[in-house]
Amino acid sequence: MDLRFTEEQLMMRDMVRSFANDKIAPFVEEMEKGVFPRDILAQMGELGLMGITVPEQYGGAGMDFTSYIIAINELSRVSAVVGVILSVHTSVGTNPILYFGTEEQKQKYLRPLAEGKKIGAY
């Protein structure tokens, strides 16, 4: 089994690491006081992170689950809050629609979720 990351995964890791350090780290104290990171999530949507595993046909980045885990790891290094938000958004909000939704539901919900315009939650 080859456990090395692909070039694409390494580039994505570096991008997420820079984003977390530059954009999330300065906001951590506010989040710890209860401020929800809406602007950060919108920026994550612009970067393709909110739809990292969603196919491009539905507005996502179309990346694999290894990339998704790398992204969560890099985000969580700076803020567990943001890492958990992405995890829940993807695993509870987006993936059930992607895997079990009708085509009509996919068309209606996946693009706004993938773009970070809607947030998936419990």
Please give the residue ranges for each predicted region.
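Intrinsic disorder at enzyme termini
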Residues: M1-E8
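A non-catalytic, amphipathic alpha-helix used as a structural packing/dimerization or gating element
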Residues: M11-D22
